């Protein structure tokens, strides 16, 4: 177990943010969707081992390109490992198992596009924010096929009576149940 890991993650994030690394990564992986993993020099004689859980199923954050795990979160894992002077071991879990793995001590931390909800905060500690999350609602095009000529929605109450799809148990599922 790595002592003061949350503090170390937050120190790393603050430094990476100040240097512009997080913005560059977000621009490359998310905004431009280029999906290019840079070479990251890992330590030859690490001081510790960092076991990180991720999902491997959410592009552009953590996904497989053929048999190679890649993405924003994966790059972040390796950058943090290099900063920490650690050997990195990545373990893949689905969303149902990843928090349980952290609680059981199978992994030291999670880097997996995971929203910090009050329910999750009861079970695990969260670092400072890694990147901003922007949410939008997609609507079906109108009968004439033109999305611009359809109904206009300006507030959540405008969606009353509409049908939605959201990840069951996710942060937006809860929001929809509370608001609409």
Regions inferred by a protein language model and the residue ranges of each:
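Short intrinsically disordered, low-complexity coil segments enriched in acidic
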Residues: 1-9, 113, 163-166
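Short loop->beta-strand "edge-of-pocket" segments that line small-molecule binding or catalytic clefts
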Residues: 46-56, 152-173
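Alpha-helical elements of the RecA-like P-loop NTPase motor core of helicases
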Residues: 7, 24, 100, 173-174
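N-terminal hydrophobic or amphipathic helices and topogenic motifs
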Residues: 4-89
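Acidic, polar ligand-binding/catalytic clefts
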Residues: 1, 43, 74, 78, ...
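Helix-loop-beta element that forms the nucleotide-linked donor phosphate-binding surface
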Residues: 180
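Short, solvent-exposed loop/turn elements at domain surfaces
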Residues: 4-7, 59-64, 119, 145-148, ...
């Amino acid at each position: 177990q790595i002592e003061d890991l949350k503090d170390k993650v937050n120190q790393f994030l603050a430094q990476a943010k100040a240097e512009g690394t997080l913005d560059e990564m977000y621009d490359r992986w998310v905004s431009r969707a280029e999906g290019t993993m840079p070479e990251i020099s890992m330590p030859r004689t690490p001081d510790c081992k960092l076991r990180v859980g991720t999902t491997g199923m959410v592009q552009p954050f953590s996904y497989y390109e053929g048999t190679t795990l890649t993405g924003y979160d994966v790059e972040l894992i390796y950058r943090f490992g290099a900063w920490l002077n650690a050997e990195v071991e990545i373990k893949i879990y689905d969303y149902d198992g990843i928090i349980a793995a952290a609680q059981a001590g199978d992994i030291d931390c999670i880097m997996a596009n995971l929203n910090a909800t009050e329910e999750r905060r009861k079970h695990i500690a969260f670092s400072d924010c890694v990147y901003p999350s922007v949410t939008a609602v997609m609507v079906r095009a109108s009968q004439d096929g033109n999305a611009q000529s359809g109904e206009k929605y300006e507030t959540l109450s405008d969606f009353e009576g509409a049908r939605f799809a959201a990840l069951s148990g996710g942060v937006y599922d809860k929001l929809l149940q509370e608001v609409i």
